[in-house]
UniProtKB/Swiss-Prot annotation:
Mitochondrial matrix side: 1-15, 67-72, 153-155, 224-232
Residue intervals passing through the bilayer: 16-34, 41-66, 73-105, 129-152, 156-183, 191-223, 233-256
Signal peptide bounds: none
Subunit note: Component of the cytochrome c oxidase (complex IV, CIV), a multisubunit enzyme composed of 14 subunits. The complex is composed of a catalytic core of 3 subunits MT-CO1, MT-CO2 and MT-CO3, encoded in the mitochondrial DNA, and 11 supernumerary subunits COX4I, COX5A, COX5B, COX6A, COX6B, COX6C, COX7A, COX7B, COX7C, COX8 and NDUFA4, which are encoded in the nuclear genome.
Topology versus the membrane: Multi-pass membrane protein
Listed name of the protein: Cytochrome c oxidase subunit 3
Family the UniProt entry places it in: Belongs to the cytochrome c oxidase subunit 3 family.
Job description of the protein: Component of the cytochrome c oxidase, the last enzyme in the mitochondrial electron transport chain which drives oxidative phosphorylation. The respiratory chain contains 3 multisubunit complexes succinate dehydrogenase (complex II, CII), ubiquinol-cytochrome c oxidoreductase (cytochrome b-c1 complex, complex III, CIII) and cytochrome c oxidase (complex IV, CIV), that cooperate to transfer electrons derived from NADH and succinate to molecular oxygen, creating an electrochemical gradient over the inner membrane that drives transmembrane transport and the ATP synthase.
Glycoprotein recorded as keyword: no
Record keywords: Membrane, Mitochondrion, Mitochondrion inner membrane, Translocase, Transmembrane, Transmembrane helix
Location of the protein in the cell: Mitochondrion inner membrane
Amino acid sequence: MTHQTHAYHMVNPSPWPLTGALSALLMTSGLAMWFHFNSTLLLALGLLTNILTMYQWWRDIIRESTFQGHHTSIVQKGLRYGMILFIISEVFFFSGFFWAFYHSSLAPTPELGGCWPPTGIHPLNPLEVPLLNTSVLLASGVSITWAHHSLMEGNRKNMLQGLFITISLGVYFTLLQASEYYEASFTISDGVYGSTFFVATGFHGLHVIIGSTFLIVCFLRQLKFHFTSSHHFGFEAAAWYWHFVDVVWLFLYVSIYWWGS
């Protein structure tokens, strides 16, 4: 395409939606195989396909936006709407877990001992590691905002520092969460408490890992001078996503760790 008379991006044919769908099929099938038959072959294949797809798809998007100029102001507006709708869909995704938790905890059945936490469950102390995790994520929210404001002001050094601090705090949170899982006295098999706790906090942990990956990509891009004060939607989307992850954790902490204990 040599000439166009509009500001929209006519996307070229791409194999990545197909390979992405294939990787999703392999990962979900692989999880079932791992749970039931203790075989990790399909899961590993799905993860490998997913990583390769993500890398090559992001590479294409970066090339189209940064080097080929396809992301005009109209295209960026559409991407903003898309990111907002994606975050709204994530809100409903986590709402299901909160619904399951409150449905079980507000009116505990006789099978649970008529109390919450259920008989025999020793919940984690909300004033120990969970409170530290809350502080870590709140601090990361401050540092990502600092990075964003620095970018808007054209201060590249401070932007990189703020982004590096945010990524470090995200990795630290993930390690703390992993240690908490390792030391917990209950498992995902321990009735409705174990299942709601590990599914809700586990999916949040997965979102922290995804958000950290998103921010690492932004950090590497900024090292190559991809973002300017007026053209940086990739970073803005990552910041929105990170703030969403922060807010979800606050609800998890208040509901499951503090009130639920």
